[in-house]
Amino acid sequence: MSTPAVFFDRDGTLMEEVHYCGDPAKVRVYAGVSAGLRRLREAGFRTFIVSNQAGIGRGLITEQQYRAVEAELTAQIGEGLIDASYFCPDMPGTPSTRRKPEPGMLFEAAAEFDVDMAASYMIGDKAIDVECGKRAGVKTIQVLTGYGAEQDCAADFRVKDVAEAIDTVLYRSRLPAPSTTSRKSNK
């Protein structure tokens, strides 16, 4: 059976934005991330990271540095709270189905983990994160951390930070689904 998921951008969403972060010592996870991820897991959501990493393609950081930062992020938030992490090293302007705003990384995760995209969310700080979610057919939440305060976009929801975004997902997931049956009038 398909399960709902939450796809998270990494930099500026789960952790403080550090331009082309290649140093694990610079990883600063936002408050509420660990507890929020735990709550999502308890509610039955899969959780994924989807991150553009053009710094690799530009030669500014190595894949090994990226993985060291990812390992530090995992250590700070807690093991087992993220199902999988996907990244795209392609530079802007390079034809790519994986680089956000293209939804390739979301579709990869959906195929690998049998994700119910109609019940899923994309959370990120940038307009490209929101556009990626829309192209994938998931609900979108823009956080005002990272670049979020500078980029107004057509997200389904705009919230202060990832903790509030997770609260929004959990609240919305408890709402009854809209009825698809038509009602007869009593004329």
Locate each region found by the language model.
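Generic enzyme active-site microenvironment
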Residues: F7-D9, V50, I123, V159
